[in-house]
Amino acid sequence: MNKENKLNPSLPSGFEDRWGKKLVLKKQLLKVIEKNFIKFGAEPLETPSFEYADNIGSFLAEDEDNPMSDVFSFEDRDKTISLKYDLSSPLARFYAQNNQALPSIYKRYAIQNVFRNEKASNARYREFLQADFDIIGNVNSAQANAELCNLISSTLLDIGLNKDQFTINVSNRKIVQGLINDLKISDDKQLRVIRAIDKLDKPGFGLKGVEDLLKKERKDVSGAVTKGADLTDEQASQILNFLKIKDLKTLKENLKNPLSQEGIKELEDVFEIIGFSSYLSEIKTNFTIVRGLQYYSDFIVETNLNFKVTNIKGKEVDIGSICSGGAYAKLISRFKGVDIPGTGISFGAVSYTHLTLPTNGLV
């Protein structure tokens, strides 16, 4: 091979090799996470890297004209197959296919790679490992969701974090849905509203960024424009006022919609159960947490660090949520035609390798 034809040793954007200490740390973290999954009663599940595209669903991407745009898909004879975007959709397919052989309350954990066909960044990869824990079946929902919160706390404490170093934020999607119903926001705008609210705590957004997304459009620092929900000034103002509420008591006094009140009551039930554990201090209400994926139906959880993280290059980075999830009522009904409730969480294992660097004091 002559000099002009030599290959350039490189990887596609959003993919990386992992070796040496970083890989050792990752494996150590996964042992801690898996130990806690087993302690909380789950059994392992492994599904193929590929699923039929229809199994993954059309509720993923923010591009409403092309909802599967964030999914890597390929034509395989007369079918479209996709690399799995998350571990929840394969779980729904597996449960629908095998539920007769599974216990009535099925707890499973899965630790596998997922793939996202989206813009990569320093802390955002297009292939990464997720570690999921889910509970499916007719279990008491407050009990199941409280168990998820306890599992998150137990795992993070075992990893080496202190209670004051992380916050488990919880909410209920019914709360904001009730407000949306009261404001008579049309169906075609509702998903954009929910995704706008979910951006509040993301870097570079804040109330102004959310307001732009609730109205005509938002232009970011690069000049890229995101289409807004095109709400009226009054509708946008009501939502922004809602986002300023921080506690259940005030929320209960201000939101009278029956669906909102139902969501508030469900959150109160979760806190009542958590009160019997030793983990209550780490768990807070945050009504701006709604999660962008359409399949979430009520309970929502998102866990964030209370300190800045330094990466291997010595640079402070925002790694975002380190564990998130929630309840879903219709994910399995796409296959079974019957609503089978489920709830679950996902740890992003790559994020935790930042935590265990010497600069962050956990090794």
Regions from the language model: what does each represent?
Residues 169-183, 198-205:
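Short, conserved secondary-structure transition motifs
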Residues 2-23:
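Auxiliary tRNA-acceptor-end handling modules of aminoacyl-tRNA synthetases
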Residues 67-76, 185-206:
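Acidic, His- and aromatic-enriched active-site or binding-groove loops in soluble protein domains
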Residues 2-3, 22-41, 51-52, 78, ...:
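Positively charged, Gly/Ser-enriched RNA/tRNA-binding surfaces
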Residues 50, 169, 193:
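Residue-level "edge-of-site" marker
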Residues 45, 49-81, 124:
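Polyanion/phosphate-binding surface patch
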Residues 354-363:
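Single conserved hydrophobic/aromatic residue that forms the stacking wall/gate
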